[in-house]
Amino acid sequence: MSAEEKKSGRVYDVEPSQLYAEFMKTGWAPSPLHGITPDDVATYAFSRRQALSAAFPGMRLILPSGNYKVRSNDTDYLYRPHSAFAYYTGVQGVEATADAVLVMEPSGDSHEPILFINPRSTRDTDAFYKDARYGELWVGRRFTLEEAQARYQIATRKISELEAFLAKDKGALVIRNQDT
């Protein structure tokens, strides 16, 4: 078993031919989302984050959304984010994606909220059609970083940047058993 197979857990996937891989990256119509407005819950989530910030001054707060729960082999249960994550971000329902993290970064006497997400997989990469967990072909369109920021009124970054961001040790409070 190769390292890639171990990583994905899908040993039955066959590597596509180069011709097929190139074909899958072409011919897709653009699918921009126009007129994204802030979610109605964004105002409430902002107030909740303010109260949370006041309760933990100077502490970095980490609220993971949780991850998928496997039902059988490669079939997952319907995803539901951790309640605290949904409460403080407003991200819920079909817009919620697994493995996201809200970090409340201390900034003076308050906090700066940063939402780390797996952004939309662009169609010019293999992830678009090969990644069964996050690829758009398999699971549908997700928000780009800009779209998520417009929708939830929270600064957003790629989840791949989280580890480096947290490397600056500031002491943190984390909701356990939800982090991946």
Question: What are these regions, as identified by a protein language model?
Answer:
Residues 1-180:
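A composition/biophysics-driven feature that prefers long, compositionally simple stretches
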